[in-house]
């Protein structure tokens, strides 16, 4: 995609998900790219756990501000009530805004305030990423999680899978009682029982 014809004709560098090389190419005259708002994805992942652990309204720090002032605007996320799912919304990265995306591991400004440990004490979380070799997950998503876990007072054990077998992950869930919460990223979406059977022990 990075060729002279694309550059001369302003063709967006789709498929690169606002990775560093795609954003840098915009400065060289390429048309742009798309960001799936990994910073918001990572925040939502851990924020939902934090809210559940604190026993507060699920939208705290999302649709409504928390005590530290963290809040998301409706143009960066969407909640599907039927699916009970939160989604980060894609955003176009262009010559006008690409400088905002030069660091793909920077927490999203409106939700980058430290929580008070007296009201949100440290909790232990087990979180797996189904494929540690995936460039987006390992180079963007996990580094963002690692920054947010500090802000949200969460002590997270990150487990990287091989992207092929569920057992590569489940074999490292030996002592569930050591954790207060779990975030599970399955290799195959029909393998939930492999995890719930371990958590029920």
Regions found by a protein language model. Name each.
Residues 124-144, 148-151, 155-172, 176, ...:
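Extracytoplasmic "Venus flytrap"
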Residues 1-24, 46, 144-145, 166, ...:
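Hydrophobic alpha-helical
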Residues 32, 180-181:
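Short, Asp-centered acidic motifs that coordinate Mg2+ and/or phosphate
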Residues 24-29, 167-178, 197:
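Short helices/loops that flank or line small-molecule/ion binding pockets
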């Amino acid at each position: 995609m990075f060729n002279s014809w694309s550059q001369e004709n302003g063709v967006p560098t789709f498929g690169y998900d606002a990775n560093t090389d795609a954003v840098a190419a915009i400065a060289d005259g390429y048309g742009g790219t798309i960001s799936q708002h990994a910073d918001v994805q990572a925040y939502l992942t851990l924020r939902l756990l934090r809210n559940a652990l604190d026993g507060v309204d699920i939208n705290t720090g999302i649709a409504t501000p928390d005590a530290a002032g963290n809040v998301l605007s409706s143009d960066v996320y969407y909640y599907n009530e039927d699916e009970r799912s939160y989604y980060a919304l894609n955003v176009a990265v262009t010559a006008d805004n690409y400088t905002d995306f030069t660091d793909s591991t920077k927490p999203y400004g409106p939700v980058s305030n430290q929580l008070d440990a007296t009201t949100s004490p440290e909790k232990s979380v087990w979180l797996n990423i189904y494929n540690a070799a995936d460039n987006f997950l390992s180079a963007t998503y996990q580094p963002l999680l690692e920054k947010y876990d500090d802000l949200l007072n969460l002590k997270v054990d990150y487990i990287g899978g091989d992207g092929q077998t569920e057992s590569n992950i489940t074999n490292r869930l030996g002592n569930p009682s050591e954790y207060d919460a779990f975030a599970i990223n399955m290799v195959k979406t029909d393998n939930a029982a492999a995890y719930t059977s371990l958590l029920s022990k």
